[in-house]
Amino acid sequence: MLGLLLFSFHSQAAESLVFSNVWSPEAPPVASVMAGYFTVENKGRKEILIEEIRSPQFKSIEIHRTEHKDGMATMAWQPHVHVPAGKRVELKPGGKHLMMFKPKQAIKHGDTITLHVSLSNNTQQTIHAKVKRH
């Protein structure tokens, strides 16, 4: 019975973040970097940080934020994404986004990218990004 209760609690903690609209724009076949976007909602009562995102299809993935200064857009690395309790955060073009480096094979329109998301509550979620023409 205790094992069942622990499993139930662990599952609820992992499911307190709900991901939607997970996608990546198609890039040229020779591209060494692709972007990724999603909306995430925290259904829990405590803030959760997205601490790391990995994929078997890319060498590495970083979280970036687009900044505008003196008419120039630059990207700044972010150590994590804060998802406040009861709130929604959107990673979108021109804002926070994923930078997925060095795809291990060609990725094209219609493909799916597997993303393993590590969270500050010591859980991990796997989500899937659909590659779309943008």
Residue ranges and their predicted role:
Residues 15-134:
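Compact, glycine-rich, soluble single-domain proteins
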Residues 8-11:
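N-terminal signal peptide c-region/cleavage motif recognized by signal peptidases
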Residues 1-2:
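Sec-dependent N-terminal signal peptides
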